[in-house]
Amino acid sequence: MLWMLARAVAFRRPGRGLAGGRGLWTGRPQSDCDSMKPLEGVRILDLTRVLAGPFATMNLGDLGAEVIKVERPGAGDDTRSWGPPFVNTESTYFLSVNRNKKSIAVNIKDPRGVRIVKELAAICDVFVENYVPGKLSEMGLGYEDIDKIAPHIIYCSITGYGQTGPMSHRAGYDAIASAMSGLMHITGPEDGDPVRPGVAMTDLATGLFAYGAIMAGLLQRYRTGKGLFIDCNLLSSQVACLTQVAANYLIGQKEAKRWGTAHGSIVPYQAFKTKDGYLVIGAGNNQQFAVVCKILNLPELIDDCKYRTNHLRVQNRKELVKILSARFAEEVTAKWLCLFEGSGIPYGPINSLKDVFSEAQVLHNGLVMEMNHPTVGKISVPGPAVRYSKFKMSEAKPPPLLGQHTRHILKEVLRYDEGAIEKLLCSGVIEQHETK
């Protein structure tokens, strides 16, 4: 029964089609589709918590997908309690990565809760989870279980280390994967200790890999009519992101080291202390180096035999950086910004967050997104990084309260009657947050 329902929803939902046209779904005239977001009509069942998974599903929601976030009654996503800071009782951490989602609070340790999740999976296009491998299978919600009732499903599993292997049973957190992948080894002062990056880059990179993989899965299903399983993990994501640093070791047998703000293969490319702050510049070729020298009024460095090529500048890094540092320290940051403006040299100050969100280009790019939260009122979060010509990314629904949409989803999506919903509420299998 669930399998038949899944097939009907997957391939007969309005706006869907399996062939023809330019878009993924072809059930509407092309003129109507031009202003639609590309994932309108796609439904995501989101069992993820914390950052990597919620970041992936938020990006999918930004593109028009309906995201149903499944949370534990009483507690919800772990990040709901992460703080301070809080706004009233809402964690700003949670608010940052959960816009454009609906929350249903369901106890998936109860068989009745498992049934609800399965019923939702049958009418969803994508199932995303970030449990330790095997945990959801124990509850009857593993890929094999969902595939039986929803063979169209794109099932994305986000873990710490992968589905198999000697570490697959371990829980995964950003800092641990950052350490084990080598990222922490190459981050920090040149002569200092390893440093955790200031934002959870491993989680975020994994979320972006999962986001891209889910999009690829939907395209694959468009071609084949079949779902698939996606194995995405923190360790693999971060090792893949080592790129040229990894290649230096794998091809050149060169062990990586920490460079602070500097670059191991390009000089000068780092932060320099000014009279009142820091300025980062990058000279990636000889022409750019010559321009930097002219701006700094150090033209004698251009033809110095020790600095004529990048290779020589890397060899003589310490001496050159000492000369440049002394010059940068003579003026305030604002003066250097004026001198570098229009030069063609990549440059910029090291900004505090106050500086970031008053930066003209940040505001111009629409990177501050405002929403009206049901209990907090107006909130601002970082907006989407990408813009599109055919549809707007500025309109967003605020992050949900825990269980805010439980009753709505059961009644309007799964067609439960009021009696069945009340029974589940009374038994604690589900939870509804009533907004005023």
UniProtKB/Swiss-Prot annotation:
Active site per the UniProt annotation: D203
This protein's encoding gene: Sugct
Lineage: Eukaryota, Metazoa, Chordata, Craniata, Vertebrata
Annotated function: Coenzyme A (CoA) transferase that reversibly catalyzes the transfer of a CoA moiety from a dicarboxyl-CoA to a dicarboxylate in a metabolite recycling process. Displays preference for succinyl-CoA and glutarate-CoA as dicarboxyl-CoA donors and glutarate, succinate, adipate/hexanedioate, itaconate and 3-hydroxy-3-methylglutarate as dicarboxylate acceptors. Acts on intermediates or end products of lysine and tryptophan degradation pathway, in particular catalyzes succinyl-CoA-dependent reesterification of free glutarate into glutaryl-CoA to prevent renal excretion of glutarate.
Matching InterPro entries: CoA-transferase_III_domain, CoA-Trfase_fam_III, CoA-Trfase_III_dom3_sf, CoA-Trfase_III_dom_1_sf
Name this polypeptide is given: Succinyl-CoA:glutarate CoA-transferase
N6-acetyllysine PTM sites in chain numbering: K392, K423
Subcellular location: Mitochondrion
Pfam family, one: CoA_transf_3
Catalytic activity as recorded in UniProt: glutarate + succinyl-CoA = glutaryl-CoA + succinate; 3-hydroxy-3-methylglutarate + succinyl-CoA = (3S)-3-hydroxy-3-methylglutaryl-CoA + succinate; 3-hydroxy-3-methylglutarate + glutaryl-CoA = (3S)-3-hydroxy-3-methylglutaryl-CoA + glutarate; hexanedioate + glutaryl-CoA = hexanedioyl-CoA + glutarate
Family classification: Belongs to the CoA-transferase III family.
Range of the transit peptide: 1-8
Coiled coil region boundaries: none
Disruption phenotype: Mice are born at the expected Mendelian ratio. They display increased glutarate and adipate renal levels associated with dysbiosis and obesity with aging. High lysine diet accelerates these pathological metabolic changes, whereas the depletion of the gut microbiota via antibiotic treatment eliminates them.
Root EC class: transferase
One GO CC term, this protein: mitochondrion
Key words, A-Z: Acetylation, Mitochondrion, Transferase, Transit peptide
GO molecular function, one term: succinate-hydroxymethylglutarate CoA-transferase activity
PANTHER family noted in UniProt: SUCCINATE--HYDROXYMETHYLGLUTARATE COA-TRANSFERASE
Disulfide bridges in this chain: none
Enzyme Commission identifier(s): 2.8.3.-, 2.8.3.13
